[in-house]
């Protein structure tokens, strides 16, 4: 295991996190305006209350008959509230997983991530390919143009 330093724009990270939180709050406000319910987007029972209020049928788990709101169902649901829930979840994931992780590990404008070459109790892979930990920089999103680009823009090249 060895480490490397990666420059981070700390102020921009705080601004991007704030921007993401504002967008998430706006989406949750739209849901509340339509349904009068303060929804917890990660709690299936809370999301179920929203769809019950709207009269929208939703899937349930086979064993426990609990509501189930997978990303696939939210993407394919024609109700606009489902899209708002999906977008709010996505934004929440970006700021709570990625930006919080960057902010937690930054020290004097740099992240000192660990690179694992071989499998061990602390990380690594069986195949010998490299893996990162603390934070895992290989998980930074690339597919989402809007949010992924903003998160990746926090990383700066060496001068």
Name the predicted role of every residue range:
Residues 1-148, 156-159:
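Conserved "right-hand" nucleotidyltransferase catalytic core of DNA-directed polymerases
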């Amino acid at each position: 295991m060895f480490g490397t330093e990666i420059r981070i724009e700390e102020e921009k990270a705080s601004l991007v996190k704030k921007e993401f939180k504002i967008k998430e709050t706006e989406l949750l406000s739209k849901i509340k305006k339509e349904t009068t319910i303060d929804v917890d987007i990660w709690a299936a029972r809370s999301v179920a209350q929203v769809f019950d209020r709207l009269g929208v049928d939703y899937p349930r788990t086979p064993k426990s008959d609990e509501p189930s709101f997978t990303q696939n169902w939210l993407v394919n649901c024609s109700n606009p509230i489902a899209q708002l829930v999906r977008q709010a979840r996505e934004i929440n994931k970006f700021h709570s997983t990625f930006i919080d992780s960057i902010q937690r590990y930054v020290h004097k404008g740099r992240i000192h991530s660990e690179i694992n070459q071989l499998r061990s109790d602390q990380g690594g892979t069986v195949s010998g390919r490299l893996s990162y930990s603390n934070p895992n920089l290989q998980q930074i999103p690339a597919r989402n143009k809007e949010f992924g680009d903003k998160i990746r823009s926090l990383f700066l090249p060496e001068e």
